Swiss-Prot record:
This is Glycoprotein. Keywords: Disulfide bond, Glycoprotein, Host membrane, Host-virus interaction, Lipoprotein, Membrane, Palmitate, Signal, Transmembrane, Transmembrane helix, Viral attachment to host cell, Viral envelope protein, Virion, Virus entry into host cell. Glycosylated by host. Palmitoylated by host. Residues 21-475 are virion surface. A lipid is attached at C497 (S-palmitoyl cysteine). The gene is G. Glycans are attached at N183, N343. It comes from Isfahan virus (ISFV). Residues 57-176 are annotated as: Fusion peptide.
Length: 523
């Protein structure tokens, strides 16, 4: 036990005194929004399997493979193209109908590049719908061609140099202009640098050829492997030139150089394989730091099984250590989940993982270089929760009195101390809203947006009166009767007034009638 502690102390001292960078993947944010992990949740990053053939003879030779170029990060943009149309239907009888519509268009490479440049410069404008242009007795369209740019990071397949995202039709893309499942949307990486395929570096590796005890007569009897090629069956291998060099194209599309001097039991190795089909392409063997990290993890840890074992512990309500939590973390840049323990409950949060270079698995300050090994040290994490007398960060990262420790990478280097073995009870949460969340919204629900932008049509307003003929007939009958009654009253009132007046009676006087005023005057 004393010797073990002594060796651990020596290794810790070595890490403290050296400054070689270790590449890891870590969340790009310093804080995350955590939510409880519900019971039954189980997600693990997958890893490749190694199938080794026993009882085979082995021959080894030195070969060169193209290293390729690993994408520096997973940042990129979604480029949307659309035609925004304002339509004015100006009827001959006066009203104007204004409608708006959006029509999808396939963006071009030049349009997307120009839109991204404008977006980064802060000059990309979203004008919206154009103002209407109305011509009498005609239908007129006003159009704007709109380019929208949305930041969208994707995953990186280090082994093949592909972009990986569910938006891609085949879930992967290896060009600088990637189609998506939406015809009007394309994805382009942030870094648009181009490289000559033959200008890349070729690195020497040791390739082993395994074959039966009897003399092989064809390539299908062989199996090739190296520390970067786990198990390559010969029946899927063919010979072809790459950058004017002889070699073999493996079943996974990668290429290794094989010279004419490489012999296998007095036969040239190349002669055992058929020629590749015309037009065959090759993939680079990416010996970048990202791949070395992935291989280093795969060699020392069975990622998938260890992750599943952690979930089994959670289901059995067994205590977990910081190392157990580290097995749940993603291994490559892109989208992923981060995990932490809060008050005895397992919490998770969606995160964007990026490449980070740290000086050692044990740091005095939680700082590292993002996106480049030659970058500037920045703070990696600021959100800590209590954990058995220590403080816990994402995916098992722990803060102790002796420094900040990354359990996964300490374990990969053979450094195990008491802090990594501290256990804590962790349980998933049965969220009370789960039954409610499973309800579906009624399909009969309608949303009314109104008739804004449409002038009233007098003809349609009048025709609307006749939508119900019974009510209309009753209304017209009532109106006619009302008019007749009014006219009748107007004619009847004068007659009534005349009857009420008294007639003047004229009386005749005999004496006065016989009186002649002229005779009286002459007298």
């Amino acid at each position: 036990m004393t010797s073990v502690l002594f060796m651990v102390g020596v290794l810790l001292g070595a890490f403290g005194s050296t400054h070689c960078s270790i590449q890891i993947v870590f969340p790009s944010e310093t804080k995350l929004v955590w939510k409880p992990v519900l019971k039954g949740t189980r997600y693990c990053p997958q890893s490749a399997e190694l199938n080794l053939e026993p009882d085979l003879k082995t021959m080894a030779f030195d070969s060169k493979v193209p290293i390729g170029i690993t994408p520096s990060n997973s940042d990129g943009y979604l480029c949307h193209a659309a035609k925004w149309v304002t339509t004015c239907d100006f009827r001959w009888y006066g009203p104007k109908y204004i409608t708006h519509s959006v029509h999808s268009l396939r963006p071009t490479v030049s349009d997307c590049k120009a839109a991204v440049e404008a977006y980064n410069a802060g000059t990309l404008m979203y004008p919206g719908f154009p103002p209407e242009s109305c011509g009498y007795a005609s239908i007129t369209d006003s159009e704007f061609y709109v380019m929208l740019v949305t930041p969208h990071p994707v995953g990186v397949d280090d082994y093949r140099g592909h972009w990986v995202d569910p938006l891609f039709p085949t879930s992967e893309c290896n060009s600088n202009f990637c189609e998506t499942v939406h015809n009007a949307t394309m994805w382009i990486p942030k870094d648009l640098k181009t490289h000559d395929v033959c200008s890349q570096d070729f690195q020497t590796i040791r390739v082993s050829v395994m074959y039966p005890q009897t003399k092989p007569t064809k390539g299908a009897d062989l199996t090739l492997k190296s520390k970067f090629h786990a198990h390559m069956k010969g029946d899927r291998v063919c010979k072809m030139k790459f950058c004017n060099k002889n070699g073999l194209r493996l079943g996974n599309g990668e290429w290794i150089e094989v010279g004419d001097e490489v012999m296998l039991d007095n036969s040239k190795l190349l002669s055992l394989f058929p020629d590749c089909l015309v037009g065959s392409v090759v993939k680079s063997t990416l010996l970048s730091e990202g791949v070395q990290t992935a291989l280093w993890e795969t060699d020392r840890l069975l990622d998938y099984s260890l992750c599943q074992n952690t979930w089994e512990k959670i289901d059995r309500k067994e205590p977990l250590s910081a190392v157990d939590l580290s097995y749940l973390a993603p291994r490559s840049p892109g989208k992923g989940m981060a995990y932490i323990v809060a008050n005895g409950s397992l919490m998770s949060a969606p995160a964007r993982y990026i490449r980070v270079w740290i000086d050692s698995p044990i740091l005095k300050e939680i700082k590292g270089k993002k996106e480049s090994a030659s970058g500037i040290d920045t703070v990696l994490w600021e959100q800590w929760l209590p954990f058995n007398g220590m403080e816990l960060g994402p995916n098992g990262l722990i803060k102790t009195k002796s420094g900040y420790k990354f359990p996964l990478y300490l374990l990969g280097m053979g450094i195990v101390d008491q802090d990594l073995q501290e256990l804590s009870s962790v349980n998933p949460v049965d969220h009370p809203h789960v039954p409610i969340a499973q309800a579906f919204v009624s399909e009969g629900e309608e949303v009314f947006f109104g008739d804004t932008g449409v002038s009233k049509n007098p003809i349609e307003l009048i025709s609307g009166w006749f939508s119900d003929w019974k009510e209309t007939a009753a209304a017209l009958g009532f109106a006619a009767i009302s008019v007749i009654l009014i006219i009748g009253l107007m004619r009847l009132l004068p007659l009534l007034c005349r009857r009420r007046k008294q007639k003047k009676v004229i009386y005749k006087d005999v004496e006065l009638n016989s009186f002649d005023p002229r005779q009286a005057f002459h007298r």
